[in-house]
Amino acid sequence: MAYSTTSFGFRYMITHVVKNLMIANVVAFFLTLLVGRDFMFDWFAFQPTQIFFRPWGVVTYMFLHGGWWHLFFNMLVLFFFGPPLEGRWGENEFLKFYFCCGLGGVALSYFFLPAVVVGASAAMYGLMLAFAMNWPNVPIYIWGIFPVKGQVPCELDCCHSCLERFRGQQ
């Protein structure tokens, strides 16, 4: 599932910006393992109390992840939903959208849930929503077998996130 939007589904194809974002996230994750989570999170996570002292955190938080699964699922979403959008919009517009979603997520967090934030989840939600809006009926095959409409993963993830938020899990 990646780039062609024909009725026959998507071909697996990674695009330039998506590949570079994935590399940057993986490198940052291994750097966190090497240097230490405390140091990396202290200096590069978004921290509402440090916004004036470490303003770069509004961008760098998107490249830090809380664990292997956090990284894996964010990169999985980027891999599947990023290339069709980059193909449609072009590299510059895709990158602008990606960072605007990340900045939007950190702004919402700052105003409504001021806590330390790491991960590219806000950008991933934006990509899934943009995909669902552009190709709502394109079939996506779960585990390569079960077809669902393109909008369904976005809807399911939003419902899951809302439930987790009410349970206090995020």
Name each region found by the language model:
Residues M1-Q170:
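A detector for small-residue-rich transmembrane helices and their helix-helix packing motifs
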